[in-house]
Amino acid sequence: MNLQHHFLIAMPSLQDPHFMRSVIYICEHNKEGAMGLVINKPMEQFTVETVLKKLKISPTPRDPSIRLDKAVLAGGPLAEDRGFILHSPQEGFGSSIPISPDTMITTSKDVLETLGTPEQPKNLLVALGYAGWQQGQLEQELLDNAWLTIEADTHILFNTPIAERWQAAANKLGINIFNIAPQAGHA
């Protein structure tokens, strides 16, 4: 099982405050473990523009039609001081890894220098921190019914309002997430 480019959708019974009602985009999944970004938990009063100012980055030439007031996401409880930019494929960044034909992740500062300019990737989200699982840990959480999974949808990833992503991802499975019982059993 490889869940790269899939969503993990938190079951209603998951009460961990980092992951309650979360949607996680899995960036990497292999025999060593998994890494993903929570895509529906905005950081309070922290925007892309705030990040650029803190890092003293002034993108030029600035295109005023490109909004920089998008929320920065709390990507997960690990390495919360590290930034991750999930975006549509675009060449030329120092530290980018393709995830799917429609998404790549970049951790180098050079992508930030394009934000708000015509060179900015078409679709993007910025997250601080990530979620990670050791070997076999995610698989066990799936067996424990902590998560639902579905192949990622770039419309949900980049275009669906943040507050609607959990329900929208579950709707892709054809279910109303609010109708799921808080406990699950095995037959």
Swiss-Prot record:
It comes from the Bacteria. One of its GO terms (cellular component) is cytosol. Pfam families: DUF179 (PF02622). Belongs to the UPF0301 (AlgH) family. This is UPF0301 protein YE3428.
